[in-house]
Swiss-Prot record:
PROSITE patterns: MFS. Pfam families: MFS_1 (PF07690). GO terms for cellular component: endoplasmic reticulum; endoplasmic reticulum membrane; plasma membrane. It comes from Schizosaccharomyces pombe (strain 972 / ATCC 24843) (Fission yeast). This is Uncharacterized transporter mfs2. Gene3D superfamilies: MFS general substrate transporter like domains (1.20.1250.20). One of its GO terms (biological process) is transmembrane transport.
Amino acid sequence: MDLLSLITGKKFEKHYSKVGSRFSDESLNGLEKQLSNGADAAIDTTADDRGSVVSLGASLPLSQGRPAKSKNILNDTLLAEDQYLVTWDGPDDPLNPRNWSHSYKWWIVIQVSVITIVVTFASSVYSSGIIDIASELHSSIPVSTLGSCTFLVGFGVGSLPFAPLSDIYGRFIIYFVTLLIFTIFQVGGGCAHNVWTLAIVRFFQGVFGSTPLANAGGTISDLFTPVQRTYVLPGFCTFPYLGPIIGPIIGDFITQSYLEWRWTFWINMIWAAAVIVFVFIFFPETHEDTILDYKAKYLRKTTGNTAYYTIHERERDPKNAMIQAATQAVSLIFTEPIVVCFTLYLTVVYIINYINFEGYPIVFAKYGFNKGEQGLSFIGVGVGIVCAGLCTPFIYWHYLKVNKKRNGVICPEDRLYPLFIGCFLLPISMFWFAWTCYPHHIHWIVPIIASAFFGFSLLIVFFVSYNYIIDSYQHMAPSALAAATLVRYSASGGISMVARPMYLNLGDHWATSVLGFISVAMVPIPFIFYRFGKSIRAWSKNAYKL
């Protein structure tokens, strides 16, 4: 048995014993007897070209229910009659992630959130040591900034392969293996003796750290219905942004202390290693096709009958899946107005966010903040992000109200309401910050309050854009989100190289104002798609038509 099967198979058996009925020898022996004797009292039979086909619903709790997915309708019809096809045991199958308890689902979301904080923390903590890195490794500050750039580009590149790989091999194994490799590359960062090694190591940290960003949406969709996702996704989305905010807060105190910049890598390595152990012990498989594969393996192992199978096992083709995912993502980003516009919006807020990691220390150093206090200046953004997350119940209540009013028929455009506020708060917060950061005339708390409104709008833009893309493209949403992730992180990585020169050359006021003017250009997007979104989706070859 290979390592993957050993890990996932054992976890499946352990998890099955918790959430569903155990297999009993009596039921399995009874099933084999019924199959051999053709006991019509317990099972239904349907004739096909091989003789009799048996539905196992009355005999085995792992065999019947909602059919597995297939792209071939005729193939679905034939396979649905196959006695050895393993599917759900009805709509209430306890192994179906949608049927797990609400508390257990949230426990899984918390685990994914912790993984996300670990990797996004790494994206920004590096910026705290750039000046020290330049000094110790005899490099310029712009060249030392390259490590931030390559990490973000790696984030974007990694989003393309890991989403389809998790659909092939399951969520757990992808989370576990990539987080393990991410942790190993922290050692390379801590031991680096030149900036080019740091840049390469940081790139691979980004690639293998991108998994929660690429797969979290899929994990949440495994567990929750679209209506439930209205409150789950905003709650989760606080963590991809809190990680980068925590980075400079902790990083500035580390580099200011006797520990020096290398400990930004060692701290990340220790934290990530602890999370790996946590994930290995507690994280279950949530991908439904993979769970069905484990069911089939369990049946083959327990009964000794190798005929049991799933559609996913027969149709699995990693090479074609990877090619299809990449070509689909590229196609969507160039041909779909919804993907193009909301990717642009996400890219703008990400660029602003990562420019702030370079700009805030410059701004607040003029207030007399020491290095540790400069990191604390990001608390305002964090407070705004948390406040946006706390608005989730009100957004969910509104969505339920619309859902009830329309008898369960709701449009993707109904997701856009929160952005009607967020789209204005973003430029307001930028101009507020730009023209109140006067150290000798205005107290530092005023721009900090402005940064809180930026954090609020940041989260609103993120979860509204994600929900709208998911609802608009449904089965193609992973490719659309992967394309958005690639573009926004690659662009953020490139722009981060010019953030410090921009603030030094333009000054605090105009550098921030430039970002404010760019965000003003994004204001019409939610209103345009609220008015014309349905027509745009009707025109599209790929979008969901209501």
